[in-house]
Amino acid sequence: AFDDLYHLYDDANFDVVVCNLKAEKKENPKWLKPYTILKTKYGTKIGVVGATALFDMFYDELGWKVTEPRKEIISVVKELIDQVDIILCMSHLGITEDELLAEECPEIDVIFGAHTHHLFKQGKEINGVLLTGCGKFGTYTGHLTIQYDHRTGRIMEKKEEVIENALLP
């Protein structure tokens, strides 16, 4: 079971971003990153951090360690804050944890929420952090727009909308 997860993304051509998952038996696999930094064609740097739910009993049985997600996310955000223009968090923690994270870490610009399959048709803002959620069963696709002013180094607007997939061509 340990090796199955350890080698799951060996051939992936993308980063797997999970800041609170660690291999217990050996070094973390090369594909496992606490964060990644993306750069747009306009030079905007976007830090992306991700975390999974604290299912420690499940991961322990597989030989993996999962740590307290909010603490780990906040630590990564502190590391990223001076390196990037925008910070996005991919959260598989659930709406309650996302709301607590938004209260504790206003440096995050957007939290992409999952786990509880909540639906925010136009996002939900807490403490300046935009929370998103697209429900379940692939019913909706989320569309996030961030308007960033390069002169001031500030986000001017951020908004989410969800599109009902049944209405797409």
Where are each of the predicted segments found?
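Acidic, metal/ion-coordinating pockets
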Residues: 1-168
